[in-house]
Curated annotation (Swiss-Prot):
Post-translational modification as stated in the protein's UniProt record: Contains one covalently linked bilin chromophore.
SUPFAM superfamilies: Globin-like (SSF46458)
Gene: pccA
The protein's name: Phycoerythrocyanin alpha chain
Keyword Thylakoid: yes
Taxonomic source organism: Mastigocladus laminosus (Fischerella sp.)
Lineage, uppermost ranks: Bacteria, Bacillati, Cyanobacteriota, Cyanophyceae, Nostocales
Amino acid sequence: MKTPLTEAIAAADLRGSYLSNTELQAVFGRFNRARAGLEAARAFANNGKKWAEAAANHVYQKFPYTTQMQGPQYASTPEGKAKCVRDIDHYLRTISYCCVVGGTGPLDDYVVAGLKEFNSALGLSPSWYIAALEFVRDNHGLTGDVAGEANTYINYAINALS
């Protein structure tokens, strides 16, 4: 999994040298943001399920057909609604991992790779998840550097879905 730390070390190792000043700056930058990233991850751990449920309800309001259409990809049944919350929660959980490592590696490895094919095969609309993630970003209640860390990875996921 790629993180700013592993990338700096890999680059130095590839050259067969110690970390350069630029690589050390990247490492120090991560450590300077680490507290905010860990606080963001804690907020996801404490609130992620609640955020996922609220985001799912937002999706149902924005796209009412998702609760009216029949089929496994829709939320017209309790099972369908549970799947929707589960999928949103998966995005949020993976975003929390990004906050911990300080990079997009978890999203790249666990979500982005094959995302378009996966959604297409299951008949899932990326717009549902974009709306859910935008809702979380706009309503999570985080502030300052903590919000900045969380929003960096929420926006990355939104862009990957777009």
